[in-house]
Regions:
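Basic/polar N-terminal segments that are highly enriched at the extreme N-terminus
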Residues: 1-4
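Histidine-centered divalent metal-coordination motifs
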Residues: 94-98, 108
Length: 115
């Protein structure tokens, strides 16, 4: 992994932890993906954000093959299809807030916009 890839993987984890802290996610629910090279980096399936390391984030290539020590989020296809169809989007955030489902924008939360 390059320094830049490690940085992006860590940013994904930080964003997941922030979602949990703000009550937008609980436990292992929800996931984040970021466009990376010819595919995407995405949170793994069934792994708690607490204690997650950069190496735990899964890369899914353009042929939908996952690379990593874990399986990608069970909703990886949802993320993959959005990123494939909408080139102007470089990240997908899927959350499960305690008091409803919705889309939340954070002006102070920075996810990478370009790999």
């Amino acid at each position: 992994m390059t320094k830049n890839e490690i940085k992006i993987r860590k940013q994904i984890i930080e964003a997941c932890l922030l979602m949990e802290k703000k009550g937008l996610n609980q436990g292992k629910a929800g996931n984040i993906s970021v466009r990376w090279k010819d595919g995407m980096l995405i949170t793994p399936s069934g792994i708690s954000y607490e204690g997650m390391k950069a190496k735990d984030i899964v890369f899914v290539d353009s042929k939908t093959k996952p690379h990593g020590i874990w399986k990608p989020s069970s909703e990886w296809r949802f993320h993959f299809d959005i990123l494939k169809a909408r080139k102007e989007f470089d990240a997908v955030v899927h959350n499960h807030p305690a008091y409803g489902t919705g889309t939340v924008s954070y002006t102070h939360l920075t996810l990478p916009t370009k790999a």
